[in-house]
């Protein structure tokens, strides 16, 4: 994460900062709980909004950690207030509030933020990476290029990353999804992202763009028969009550950048900027340790709930069909979309060679 750390510190007026991250298993207990930090003179509130209402979601885990670290590194001069469960609006609304400085921090899905910051669509290209290690490395290496672009496009600054896990098919059907043609008879919900919609069409599926907040009722009423999300979301939102199957594959991982209002950030002192950037860096390292442990728990719960789980062991047909759409969507990344996609591929190939 060294290159990411260097970039996140850009704009901190050369403040030297030690970014060594203590393993969460060995770290001292946090002296501050984000819900009740001690008051100090001139204390300012950092409003944090996100869309998930699960107490122990990876959203909650990383944002609590981030808020605690900001409080610690600013000596309680900046304290966080977390508003979960879309209390402040959906993700598009919260991104708008963040770019305006009304909200200081939010955690949108990359595919949702890409509506304002198209450069991030490079992460949405299907099968651009096929392992969590590749995704983490790509984030670390490509973020230096993306930070200034996203600031210009959306008015928000990436200070860290949360990965919720690989998107898996969840659905109600008599037979499992194993090959692309198995999607033909299923109405599947997709986020309103053009690349994700095109991926389903390439597989011969029937994508139905639908807001996340509408999904449970749509499944219950048969408007759609499934979709794809990490198992944490599927089980946390109790979709197992209205679906009976899940299929594991690796076409894209659900990622969420921690973004702060650039307007707010530029109004901070240099010490406070450095503290926010350090907190984002360390919260990223923390969630990368925490998330796989949590995800394994949710898969076990899905199995216990009676969900039939299938794993696609040979994804070559899925990969071939999905990657064929890439050239059509370089423009959705930007004028240099192809070059940015090639840079991402080169980063991953170099990473593979080093393993």
Where are the model-predicted features located?
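Bacterial Sec-dependent N-terminal signal peptides
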Residues: 1-10
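Secondary-structure junction/capping motif
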Residues: 5, 56-57, 141, 145
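Short, solvent-exposed linear motifs at loop/edge-of-secondary-structure regions
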Residues: 7, 20, 321-324
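Polar helix-capping/helix-linker motif
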Residues: 10, 140-141, 193
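Bacterial N-terminal signal peptides
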Residues: 11-20
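N-terminal secretory/targeting leader peptides
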Residues: 13, 26-134, 151-153, 157-355
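Signature of the catalytic double-stranded beta-helix
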Residues: 137-151
